[in-house]
């Protein structure tokens, strides 16, 4: 049986801030359905944003409770773990993991990783709900 996968792209945005110690912060702008790609790629967008492709939401039976807790919440989310890294000579927020599981996101945060979230798009919710009902 094939593992359920849903291809997504991630947009990270650099936002200027007024602060004595730092001049900017990174934020997760969106997670959207995308075509399946074989490799991670990044394209600069206007407004200091970067569009990352090549990610998937993978569903694992062992995470079913975490998906259920997320989808049954008033504001279900897609979680993205990201790190500040250099990509092709530019320092940027590079996504590493996308998940729908509260538990997986919490484990990453407990491990010291940066995890942000955005509201789950309707297409992703419609994809995961039947799987969740079966598991």
Name each region found by the language model:
Residues 1-122:
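Terminal targeting/leader modules
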Residues 115-135:
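Mixed-charge, glycine-accented linear interaction segment located at domain edges/termini
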């Amino acid at each position: 049986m094939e593992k359920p996968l849903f291809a997504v792209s991630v947009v990270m945005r650099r936002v200027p801030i007024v602060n004595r110690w730092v001049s900017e912060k990174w934020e997760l702008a969106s997670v959207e359905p995308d075509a399946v790609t074989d490799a991670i790629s990044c394209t600069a967008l206007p407004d200091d944003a970067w569009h990352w492709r090549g990610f998937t939401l993978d569903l694992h039976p062992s995470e079913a409770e975490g998906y259920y807790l997320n989808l049954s919440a008033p504001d279900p989310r897609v979680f993205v773990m990201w790190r500040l890294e250099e990509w092709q000579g530019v320092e940027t927020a590079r996504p590493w993991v996308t998940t729908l599981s509260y538990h997986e996101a919490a484990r990453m945060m407990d491990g010291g990783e940066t995890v942000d979230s955005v509201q789950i798009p309707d297409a992703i919710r419609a994809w995961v709900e039947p799987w969740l009902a079966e598991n």
